[in-house]
Curated annotation (Swiss-Prot):
Any Pfam family the entry gives: DUF525
Source species of the chain: Rhizobium leguminosarum bv. trifolii (strain WSM2304)
Annotated disulfide bonds: none
Domain of life of the native organism: Bacteria
Domain ApaG: 3-127
InterPro entries reported in the protein's UniProt record: ApaG_domain, ApaG_sf, Uncharacterised_ApaG
UniProt-recorded name of the protein: Protein ApaG
Gene Ontology biological process terms in this record: error-free translesion synthesis
Species classification: Bacteria, Pseudomonadati, Pseudomonadota, Alphaproteobacteria, Hyphomicrobiales
Amino acid sequence: MYRALTKDIEVVVEPFYLEEQSDPEDDRYVWGYRIVISNNSAIAVRLVNRYWNITDQNGQVDEVTGPGVVGEQPRLSPGDTYEYSSGCPLDTPSGLMFGHYQMETDEGEMFDVDIPAFSLDSPGLLRVLN
């Protein structure tokens, strides 16, 4: 698992290889990842936007931005957690992802919460990027 803490908001990521959706002979490698966001702060926040930097084994970078996560913009009161799962396909057997969430307080203050860098490694492959 990979962890990051920003302003008492913790992001934990657990990536996993999706062998049944991958086809190495066709250069298709797919990972899922489970993310748990815990609001350990004293204020409520809403996850407004996301930013991902996805880098494959060859250094090809794909930047992804958009509103919320998996179609939601969850509000986390102090002590709340929010969990979701998503996925990422690559053309190479290894990669790296990191990013941030843009959060907004009830007072309208915006700030970024780090998503830790995490490896996407095919089973049996030595770690290349992390």
